A protein has these predicted regions:
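C-terminal boundary of histidine-terminating zinc-finger modules
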Residues: 117-128
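Short, hydrophobic alpha-helical segments
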Residues: 138-149
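Conserved Rossmann-fold dehydrogenase catalytic segment
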Residues: 110
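Conserved catalytic-core segment of NTP-binding enzymes
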Residues: 4-10, 15, 20-104, 113
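Active-site donor-binding loop signature of nucleotide-sugar glycosyltransferases
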Residues: 107
Length: 151
């Protein structure tokens, strides 16, 4: 884990992103919040029904943890899959949890190409439109958290 390896102390990150399976809302998911490593949680989802269901479960868990003094829900990020009524479904999810969609990521073949090349997209195609979408999302997350990205 990051804690056991001393990563928090060594790197002192402003933002840490945990990618967890949406259908597994369990102790591993909540540990960063309970240990004080998270102030805000952002839920990423597409408009697919199972993804919406999983995102709702995570948002509900975050709301329960917030009531115990842990992290709060910072917003929803739409990872587009181009399914029917996608925007509408995700907007309804955000409304149900009194939050907002803070970012939208278009579906991109470049992401899969980067993965096949063993790189992250910003390394694989730093000047691409998709890389710009990720930078914009980073700025939006920092804005919600009350921070700014250094120039």
């Amino acid at each position: 884990t990051l804690e056991k390896k001393g990563a928090y102390e060594k790197y002192r990150p402003d933002v840490v992103i945990y990618d967890v399976l949406g259908d597994v809302v369990c102790g591993g998911f909540s540990m960063p919040m309970r240990r004080g490593y998270a102030d805000k949680v952002f839920v990423i989802t597409s408009g697919e029904n199972m993804a919406i269901h999983a995102a709702a479960n995570i948002a509900m868990a975050v709301e329960n943890f917030k009531n115990r003094g842990y992290a709060s829900l910072g917003g929803i990020i739409l990872n587009k899959r181009e399914v029917p009524r996608e925007e509408e479904k995700v907007r309804e999810l955000a409304e149900d949890f009194h939050t907002q969609i803070i970012g939208r990521l278009d579906r991109s073949e470049l992401v899969m190409e980067a993965e096949e090349a063993g790189k992250v997209l910003l390394e694989y195609a730093p000047d691409s439109q998709m890389a710009e979408e990720y930078r914009k999302l980073a700025d939006q997350i920092l804005a919600v958290c009350g921070e700014e990205r250094p120039c």
